[in-house]
């Protein structure tokens, strides 16, 4: 296919603005799949995505299109996630495209992720095509949407295409706008082969399937290719394009988006953002890859059975292949054995990884309480970064501590502004800006600690605003804080896997919450169990699980009181001895309960 007839674009938008539904309509219109095989959210091929109704992985697909003037085009497009935790997926999709469809819900208008995704596209010089979706809804307000496109986004509202992805309205006009307004890939002056790896997945029979965008040269079956980051060489066994399923081709030429398989079994050889070149005529310089993503939430993960450690490691490596933003390193715990310390982009990312490990890889795992990465200055003047309670130094060695702060942008209907301001203030937020976008919508900007957003902020924000508020954030640096380590003790023994780092002002509530949760989860034993929350040697919270006891007086009908007292004393001695040797068994549900946040007020 000539370069001038190829169009590469992605669909970006806020959560629930209809990206996957629009992708469904484009695919149906192109007739690349039989109606019998078609299902909604066709590109969302994970069970989690379908159940939650969200997109987690960007998915590429190639569709043919014959324009009104009779010219045939090849359209490569990527359906992207909308949630703030998966912005990295969006940025990778954007790097392999020349244009972006910016989708706006006609009933909701411009929201926080709409803005941040547009700025991402502008950073990469993409042609932005605004699309107003859901025009069939009774609540659709098209004039207001056009006003927001002009004033909030700075785009020409007359360029906006009106569609209803659900009903299929306006899809023909959208196709024509794509071929007319999104530019074709630029021809390269360099004759050497250069292809950017923007994703991968693991096939148990064929090894690693590498997703690429070819910028110059071509990739063919039988060609020997080289990865420029580590000089590993492989021979291509198969190349092709994505038409929902993999469709083999003879070659991938410049401008194309597709895949290649080269019998790669060493998962660590592949790095998303790397450049693939030809081993015979290698390129001198690699393509600009992706910005290294920095995890913001950390949690340790352990197998339920310590014998499954090697299986868990293999699963983590295969998962990292398909999710480049996941980071992990070896970790160990006295209570839980060997495991991994993992970095995530947010709490939803953590939940998704946990579900994928359990469903896709059949792993039973325990996650510890999530934490952020703190900066600690020791009395010796040395600065260290700590994201795990196990690494936390003695309080006497700490001169000062700092925690990461975020700039949070919240767009909400004016009706709910009061309760949202109260929530942000409770979460130690400082308001930096507030502006009315129109008579009904307000944007408020807060600077607040990232650790406060981890627990129940997002749920409560949605609850207070009846689901209408939208939230986006950027990490802006570190600020001073008062940090303490909360230890959880069971009958005087510290359980390292339940320890947490917390702001001093929240420590009492956090410790009490964990103790209450554990009391509900730990089954009664034959001896009393004391559950305590402590900072250093000071106990700040306590709950008690009462013992089960046998009625030793059941056989005594009347008789001397000293006989009864003797039996009770004997039972008491036995309980004391049992407590000395008895270990408290913690069920997996106890670890999961600690992760649960307090219900929104």
Regions found by a protein language model. Name each.
Residues 1-601:
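Structural and coupling elements of P-loop NTPases
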């Amino acid at each position: 296919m000539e370069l001038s007839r190829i169009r590469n674009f992605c669909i970006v938008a806020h959560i629930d603005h209809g990206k996957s539904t629009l992708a469904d309509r484009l695919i149906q219109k192109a007739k690349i799949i039989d109606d019998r095989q078609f299902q909604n959210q066709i590109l969302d091929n994970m069970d989690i995505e379908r159940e939650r109704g969200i997109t987690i992985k960007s998915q590429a697909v190639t569709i043919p299109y014959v324009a009104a003037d009779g010219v045939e085009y090849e359209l490569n497009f990527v359906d992207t996630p909308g949630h703030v935790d998966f912005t990295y997926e969006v940025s990778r999709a954007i790097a392999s495209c020349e244009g972006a469809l910016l989708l706006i819900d006609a009933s909701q208008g411009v929201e926080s992720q709409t803005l941040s995704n547009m700025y991402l596209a502008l950073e990469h010089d993409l042609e932005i095509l605004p699309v107003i979706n859901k025009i069939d809804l009774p609540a659709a307000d098209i004039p207001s949407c056009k006003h927001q496109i002009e004033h909030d986004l700075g785009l020409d509202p007359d360029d906006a295409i009106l569609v209803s992805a659900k009903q299929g309205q306006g899809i023909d006009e959208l196709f024509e706008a794509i071929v007319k307004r999104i530019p074709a890939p630029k021809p390269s002056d360099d004759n050497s082969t250069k292809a950017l790896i923007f994703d991968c997945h693991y096939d148990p029979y064929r090894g690693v399937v590498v997703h690429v965008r070819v910028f110059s040269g071509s990739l063919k079956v039988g060609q020997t290719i080289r990865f420029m980051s580590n000089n590993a060489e492989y021979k291509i066994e198969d190349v092709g394009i994505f038409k929902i399923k993999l469709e083999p081709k003879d070659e991938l030429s410049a401008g194309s988006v597709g895949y290649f398989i080269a019998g790669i079994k060493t998962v660590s050889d592949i790095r998303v953002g790397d450049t693939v070149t030809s081993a015979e005529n290698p390129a001198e310089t690699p393509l600009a890859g992706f910005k290294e993503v920095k995890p913001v939430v950390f949690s340790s993960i352990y197998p339920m059975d310590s014998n499954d450690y090697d299986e868990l490691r293999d699963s983590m490596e295969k998962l990292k292949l398909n999710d480049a933003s996941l980071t992990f390193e070896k970790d160990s715990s006295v209570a839980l054995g060997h495991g991994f310390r993992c970095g995530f982009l947010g709490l939803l990312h953590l939940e998704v990884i946990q579900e994928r490990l359990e469903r896709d890889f059949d792993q039973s795992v325990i996650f510890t309480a999530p934490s952020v990465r703190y900066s600690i200055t020791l009395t010796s003047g040395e600065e260290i970064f700590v994201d795990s309670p196990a690494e936390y130094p003695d309080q006497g060695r700490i001169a000062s501590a700092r925690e990461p702060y975020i700039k949070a942008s919240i767009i909400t209907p004016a009706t709910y502004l009061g309760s949202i301001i109260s929530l942000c203030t409770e979460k130690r937020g400082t308001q930096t800006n507030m502006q009315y976008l129109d008579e009904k919508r307000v944007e408020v900007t807060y600077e607040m600690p990232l650790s406060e957003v981890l627990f129940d902020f997002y749920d409560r924000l949605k609850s207070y605003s009846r689901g209408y508020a939208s939230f986006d954030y950027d990490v802006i640096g570190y600020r001073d804080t008062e940090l303490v380590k909360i230890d959880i003790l069971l009958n005087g023994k510290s359980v390292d896997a339940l320890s947490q780092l917390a702001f001093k002002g929240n420590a009492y509530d956090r410790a009490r919450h964990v103790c209450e949760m554990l009391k509900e989860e730990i089954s009664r034993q034959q001896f009393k169990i004391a559950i305590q929350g402590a900072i250093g040697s000071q106990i700040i919270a306590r709950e008690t699980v009462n013992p089960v006891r046998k009625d030793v007086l059941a056989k005594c009908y009347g008789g001397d009181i000293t006989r009864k007292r003797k039996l009770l004393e004997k039972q008491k001695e036995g309980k004391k001895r049992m407590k000395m040797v008895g270990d408290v068994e913690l069920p997996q549900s106890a670890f999961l309960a600690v992760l649960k946040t307090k219900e929104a007020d």
